[in-house]
Amino acid sequence: MRLIPLKNNPGWWAARYIAGKIKTFSPSAENPFVLGLPTGGTPISMYRELINLHRAGEVSFKHVVTFNMDEYVGLPEDHPQSYHYYMHENFFNHVDIPKENINLLDGNAPDPEKECEAYEQKIINHGGIQIFVGGVGTDGHIAFNEPASSLSSRTRIKTLTLETRMGNSRFFNNNMEEVPKYALTVGVGTLLDSKEVIILASGLNKALAVSYAVEHGVNHLWTVSALQLHRKGILVCDEDATMELKVKTLKYFKQIEVDNLQDPK
């Protein structure tokens, strides 16, 4: 597993890395680049930089197919806190990705189980995901794979923990009662099937999760630790998010990644 310890803005690094991978891949209509995408606060800077790169002519999303990580159950698609709304407002509306290339879970599907099974099959039909990007919760969850989730789990409906709902209440007028209790989410196994996984971590409140991801063993109570099992897992952090790491751990990764901090590769 790689750790990219930055001063700030892990989203900038991820955007540059992804753009480089897309260009190298040279996608076409017959062979698109398949990208897994997150929501939340930390990825906003990644989307802004991807939009900047697109406007500068450095990357196109015309032949990119996207799959999002998760969606709340019961929120209308046009609700300001639905992930459909988030993705279009923060990314899709600003780049050249065709509408038919966008895949998002339907949190209002009449049969959530069938919706999740179909989503998994659609990923398989596209040949799998090249890069899946995610964030991490304060309790170490990735996507909505809450603590004690199976590390081989697939896309499914999940009950959100009190901690997750409290953390997300900042997007719902700080009223936890407005935060949905359920969500559809890709599984840990779904993420691990991707050819590469990038996890973004920003802020002191993510520092404990980062330490469990890097310095502790694989543990289903900290689902981010499953990144250790991936052949091409990358954890991109700002300085605050590394505060719980041992000094020698941080020094080690700074030394081996010194050439990649400003030139993502």
Curated annotation (Swiss-Prot):
Keywords: Allosteric enzyme, Carbohydrate metabolism, Hydrolase. InterPro entries: Glc/Gal-6P_isomerase, Glucosamine6P_isomerase, Glucosamine6P_isomerase_CS, NagB/RpiA_transferase-like. It catalyses: alpha-D-glucosamine 6-phosphate + H2O = beta-D-fructose 6-phosphate + NH4(+). Pathway: Amino-sugar metabolism; N-acetylneuraminate degradation; D-fructose 6-phosphate from N-acetylneuraminate: step 5/5. One of its GO terms (cellular component) is cytoplasm. Its EC number is 3.5.99.6. GO terms for molecular function: glucosamine-6-phosphate deaminase activity; identical protein binding. The active site is at residues 70, 139, 141, 146. Gene3D superfamilies: 3.40.50.1360. GO terms for biological process: carbohydrate metabolic process; glucosamine catabolic process; N-acetylglucosamine catabolic process; N-acetylneuraminate catabolic process. Allosterically activated by N-acetylglucosamine 6-phosphate (GlcNAc6P). It is an enzyme of class 3 (hydrolase). The record marks 149, 156, 158-159, 252 as: Part of the allosteric site. Catalyzes the reversible isomerization-deamination of glucosamine 6-phosphate (GlcN6P) to form fructose 6-phosphate (Fru6P) and ammonium ion. Belongs to the glucosamine/galactosamine-6-phosphate isomerase family. NagB subfamily. NCBIfam families: nagB. This is Glucosamine-6-phosphate deaminase. It comes from Maridesulfovibrio salexigens (strain ATCC 14822 / DSM 2638 / NCIMB 8403 / VKM B-1763). The gene is nagB.
